Amino acid sequence: MRRLFTSESVTEGHPDKICDQISDAILDEILKKDPYARVACETAVTTGLVLVMGEITTQCYVDIPKVVRKVVEEIGYTRAKFGFDADTCAVITSIDEQSPDIALGVDKALEAKRGELSDSEIEAIGAGDQGLMFGFACDETEELMPMPIMLAHKLARRLAEVRKNGTLSYLRPDGKTQVTVEYEDDKPVRVDSVVVSAQHAPEIDHDTIERDIIEHVIKPIIPENMIDDKTKIFVNPTGRFVIGGPQGDSGLTGRKIIVDTYGGYARHGGGAFSGKDPTKVDRSASYAARYVAKNIVAAGLAKKCEVQLAYAIGVATPLEIGIDTFGTGKISDEKISEIVKQVFDLRPAAIIRDLDLRRPIYRQVAAYGHFGRHDLDLPWEKTDKVDILKKLAGI
């Protein structure tokens, strides 16, 4: 059976991604000085303005406007004619402390209050909120990620690369990519279409941009054996993309959650990642779920695996650890679920401990995806549980 599947990505200069990077840069700066800080930092951008808001509980001081300007400058918004300039944009902050009602549940988990967990067993942290999270892995790519989102991310990163290294110096920071992959019997066989929208200087004509993007962005990224004479390529299909970034659209933290994860190929619990410290299970449990799913696929227990976790606020033990291998498992999903419970401790404190999440590691994943990042040394991408999983599964 043949089918098509599409995923998109955006560059670091996309308005929503600017916000994600600012929120995570502030989080990193705080975690450098206070690893136990509570941070829920949201950012909004529009023409000439950055608004940083949220709840932060910490003993340290961080110069938020300085962090904001540094991020905006590194992305490449350094001229007023771009409609957004690191030196001249206004930065407004509105920060409160975390609600003491939430802290009550997170600081000491419900089980610890009832005496069900000893402090020597684990530093008992209850989940910072209720919610459901998904993790996913499949054997379509070496990163154990779906092919459409990986190609879309690589195209978006390549757009930024050729802009910054001067290969295509007329490009500006905003941009989007989209890849449609054709599957036959659940295996990717060809790329059906590629869409690249790249912000550019006004004096460059469309034909030049199209030729350059195909030559310097698309050809180096899309494998030759995945393209044929029926593959459709669209470069700036409106013909012009001069006004972009926060001048073209306002941006908000947490509005690119599908780009951040699996490109729509797997389910999503709805919670965003950026700007949240690791006591927020929206973030930490999603990373843990990916860690579990990736190890299951890497161990050969399944070709495809989706892990669902669910939590109650203030309760450490997950309410659910669900496994779905979509019929690709070497053993039953129920058996895999039992093995997962033996191998992985999915209480929030254990996730934070085992994945070492109280570190300033978040700005680097705030653009181009949180998963499948072979360019980074991310703890949730390690496959260090493969041997024990194989042993317990008997394969």
UniProtKB/Swiss-Prot annotation:
Question: What keywords appear on the UniProt entry?
Answer: ATP-binding, Cytoplasm, Magnesium, Metal-binding, Nucleotide-binding, One-carbon metabolism, Potassium, Transferase
The biological processes this protein is annotated with in GO are: one-carbon metabolic process; S-adenosylmethionine biosynthetic process
Binding of Mg(2+), residues: D16
Q: Whose protein is this, by species?
A: Thermoanaerobacter pseudethanolicus (strain ATCC 33223 / 39E)
Its chief place of residence is cytoplasm
Residues of the region (Flexible loop) are: 98-108
Co-factor(s): Mg(2+); K(+)
Q: What gene is behind this protein?
A: metK
Q: Specify the protein name.
A: S-adenosylmethionine synthase
Instruction: Identify one Pfam family in the record.
Output: S-AdoMet_synt_M
Lineage at the top is: Bacteria, Bacillati, Bacillota, Clostridia, Thermoanaerobacterales
**Gene Ontology MF term list:** ATP binding; magnesium ion binding; methionine adenosyltransferase activity
